[in-house]
Amino acid sequence: MFLTDKIKNDLTESRINWKVALIMIPVAFLTYLFHEFGHWIVGELLGNKMLYSLNNVTTASENYLHESDNLFVAIGGPAFTILQAIIFLIVIEKTKSIYVYPVVFFAGFVRFFSIIFGGFNKQDEAYISAMLNIGAYTFAAIVLLILLAIVWRSSAILKLNLKAVGYFTVLSVISILIVIATDKLISR
């Protein structure tokens, strides 16, 4: 058996077809936008004028109205990412649809990828831990454990094995690199 035949069989076994693979790209963009929307909406609800982009939200004045707004705005992004994963876990529980799985998987993957490869100290979770004066990795660990549990539950419902998760990881890496490249192009 050739390697290409092995991969084709693995993808079929993992229920990954072209539709599922292509869904990952818009899911990646929408996940980034939803995460940033979490920051933006919290800031706006607290009365701050916020500026929104694909991979960043900041105040128009560069200062929040209240010092505590920093913390709440920082929590908004990870909270919305967890909310996304929970909502689509519920959809998976109801529909058992493989087409929904990328939304749950990418929510977990994007926080893991950002924390590990994006420079930990630049991430929301590190900033939140510092503001709460808890261990540097505490909030990141909490967020990642919640998302891991949701991804694990979704994988179990859909009977996806570790090999399938590996293929979704590859698709997620490709998708996240497309988002990062797009952000760099539009941020010039």
Predicted regions, residues:
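Metalloprotease/metallohydrolase-associated module, dominated by Zn2+-dependent proteases
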Residues: 53, 61-158, 164-183
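Short acidic DE-rich linear segments
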Residues: 186-188
